[in-house]
Structure formats: C-alpha cells, structure tokens
Amino acid sequence: MLLEAVYHRPKLNWCYAYDGHTIHLRIRTKRDDVTAVSAMAGDKYIWDQSMSYVPMHKLAADELFDYWECEIVPEYRRLKYGFLLENGPEKYWMTEYDFLKQPPENPDRLFEYPFINPADVFKTPEWVKDAVFYQIFPERFANGDPSIDPTGALPWGGTPERDNFFGGDLQGVIDHVDHLSKLGVNAIYFTPLFTATTNHKYDTEDYMQIDPQFGNIETLKKLVGICHERGIRVLLDAVFNHSGRTFAPFVDLQKNGENSRYKDWFYIREFPIAVQDGIPTYDTFAFEPLMPKLNTDNAEVKEYLLKAAAYWIEEADIDGWRLDVANEVDHEFWREFRRVVKKLKPDAYILGEIWHESSPWLMGDQFDAVMNYPFTNAVLDFFVDGIGDARNFANAIGKQFSRYPRQANEVAFNLLDSHDTARLLTKCDGNKDKMKLAAQFQFTYTGAPCIYYGDEIGMTGGHDPDCRKCMEWDEAKQDQELFSFYQELIRLRLKYSALRTGNLTFLSAEEGSANLVYTREDAKDKIVVFMNNAAKPQNIEVAVEEDSWEDIRSGEAISARLGALNIKLPAYGCVMLRVV
C-alpha cells in the first residue's frame, strides 16, 4: 500500500456538510492500490458508545488516484473520524497524525468536524439541479422592435463582424418564447443587457440601465414575467471586473486625470493615462484600453456595484447572476456580493466565469457554481477532437468531479460552446452524429446543461465573431430533426432524476477503446448508458446484476444474458437502458 499517495484534510471538498445534518467524507488513495476503505467515526464526547465503521465507496478515479466517499448523519451534528485502509490482509488506520497498524487507542488524534453550524453549510439553489439553460446573445437572437435599432443596423442574417449590429432586442426574445417552451428549456442565460457601446455589451456604460437598443426596464420586466409564467428562470450577466470607456467615472478620469475624484475607482499605474506600446498605463481586462479594471476594494465602487446587483433582483425579479472574469475580482467583494444577493433572493443562482479549477470560490461563501470548462474540455477532447481514449476521458471526468463538494457539482454550468468559442457543430466538422453523442453525455451528467442559441437547429460558426450569427428563424432553413433530438434529450433528463443527480459509475472505459458505458443511479432508477465514440459500428458487452431492462427512448424490452448486456451500436451511437 503506497501510503505516500493517501490524502485527506478536514473541510474543503474532503470533509464538508452537505446539508444541515449530513457530512460527506472523502479520501484519496493510489489508483487500484487499496481494496476497501472505511471511516471510523463517532462523537468525540461519547466515543466508546458511538464509534462505528462506515464503508466508503469509490466516488471517482483519475490516472493516478482513487477517490472514496461516504455519507454520515451524526446524531449530534459533530464528528470525530479516521480511516481504515485495506488491501487484502494489509491494514492501516489513518489518524490526523499518522498511519497505524493497530486501531488508535483513543480518538484524541483523529480528524474532526467540530459542528454543523447552519451558517457554514454551503447551500445551492435546488431549482438549478433541474435546470436546462439556453444561452442568448441578445443582439443576434431576434429583432422584435426595429424602432430602437442602433444607427447603421444591418438587415437580419448578414455576416457578423466584431463591430456591426443587426438589431436584436428583448422584444425579439418575447416574440420567440414559444420556441424556448417548445424546445423544453427552463432557464435562460443572457449575455449583458446593460448600456454599452459594443454589440456584446461587455464594456458597461451604465449598470443601472438596459441598453436602449434592447429596450428598457419595462421590457425586461415583461420578459421575466412571461418566462416565470412558463417556468423559465432568467440569469443576467454582470461585468464587475471592468467597465467600459464610456462609464461616467472613467470619462471623468480621462478628462481630469490625477484630479478626478474617481481616480481610485480604477488601478492607475501612471498619469496621464495613456497606451504605451500597446500596454495601457492603467489595469484593464487583458490589455484592452476600452475596458478599465474596477477597484472593487474601493468603498464607492463596491457600493455602486452591489446596488446594481440588488436593483435588478428587486425591480425585475431576475433569478441570478453570471459573473464575467470572476477570478480576477477579489474574494472579499464576492463574499459581500453573495450576502447581498442571497438576502434578497435566497435561491438566486450565482455563477462565476472561471475557466480553471475553482475550489477557492466554491466553499459556500462566494459562488454557487462556475462555468465548468474542465468538463467542456474533457468532452470536446474525447467526443469531438478524438484526443485520448475512454480511459483518459473517464479520468478527466473523475478528477473534475472529485474537486468540488457534491452540492457544487449538482449545479455546475455544463456547456459545450458559447459566444466565446466556435459552435459545437462546427467543431464537429458538420458531423451531427458526433455532435449528438457529445450532447448526450452533457445531458446525462451531473450539473445543468446549457444549449447555445441556434445549436438546436443546426447553426454553425467558427470563433468570435462567426459564432455570433443572427438566429435563423426561417423554419425551412432550420434542422428540425436536430431540434427534435434536443427536445427528446431535455424530456428524458427532466423525466429521470437519476440523469440529473444520481451517482455516476463507469462500467467500461478502457485504455485504447472508444466505447464508454456508465450508470446513473438514484433511489428511483438505475440507467446504464452505452456510447460508441467510433466511426464504425461496435458491439459492447458489460456485466450487470439485473436481468430486465428497457430502452428509455423506444420502450423496447431488453434482457441480459448470462449476467451481461450485449449492445450493438452504430457509429457514434448511444443507447440508454433502465432497470425494470
């Protein structure tokens, strides 16, 4: 047993309160090095009467490690614990201090979860577990009110450029809510709606005003009301890392320089502010001089931005915020942001844009979730780009899942493309079967899937600005078969809770193989998913305990033979079977 590989620490994702009564414990061991792990757990004040061994199950694995987990409901909301590691006859007891070959004589040097204090429990919005998001880039979704088109707006459907406009607005979304209801989505994520000079609106001019080319606050209220009547939640985009060049405090700074009362609203390295060899003398988003970075440690800046965060919840009843460039803003600002937002709307969804491992933001005091780009990369590598085999993919998924507490995984924002990337169908070189297979994993995985507008009807597009084409509303030019496919995926996900929050176990993910088999299981259902990520048909066989199954799409009855299911799949095929 390689003890050097064994890892655990209290709190974070290793020992945390899942709710007000339940504690999850996790421990890491070298892959395939330990055959069984148990938690020895009890109350520190009545250890002899309360201690018991709780078996742990293998939660996930990656290329180096196995991750084990168990759930404990302590009678008095506190826990003293250690671990028993077994590899056949070999046994070690792990304490906070050491590895022992005999059980510890007393609990003094074990790990401890002191008490489940309600204020410390990481609570995420329940509704997000059941959400299917649809991302809308407002300027390109639909033009519902030509009277508010920006000057120089082009006819709908032209070639997107970084600086052109087509007149998309909020009335256009209202006009096409039926499309969203028909598709089956129950949440919308809008890129920024506030006053700005660009078509993407990430250069905010006024955080308290809807951009006139999109409508006004009354239009937004109407849209949110219509969405809520249909069971659709609404998420807005906040750009609190930086403003735009026309933001009034920055305009004043440009005019008055070091004498501006707003000079401390930004990070100025040198006056007068200028751009020298392509580098501004003030901090910005990237090196973009038109997007000066805001000083969120400044009391006035903080007050203004938190007021904006509250305003749109109070006035328009929005359901949460997506936070742009979230990892470049200080943690203390986000802690205050969470307190303000959750006080107004406890089930508001706080989603950070972070493209990397995000544990520091997912400890219950800042975000509910992040945009799950490690998931995105793993899915695209395997299903789209053919990088790595099934084992590599399962390792990447296991590693990512093990990083966060379960409640954060359950509301993770799982996307495969967006306004920042090439479109999924384009990434698949137009191969719809590959696109569908990737989407089927997305919709049968823990977390909230998101469809980028137009993907459901076969829209294509390379990197920005090509991925921001005008939505195609001519039904003759829409891929209706693909639309039906997404409808069915959404229907199945919402029908079976196991596909949303059930435990995931890989039954087959072998080195050198393109085949993938995994189960999603909860108290209601057990579903096994077979995937063939190859360009030719494959027979896939996997051992199962149950005899009777049904195809959840067709309803066809399937029987296991000699303790195994044998499924023939076409190229890039997928079958989902449920125990009956």
Task: Provide a role label for each language-model segment.
Residues E139-A142, F194-T195, F240-N241, N327-E328, ...:
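Short, solvent-exposed loop/turn segments at secondary-structure junctions
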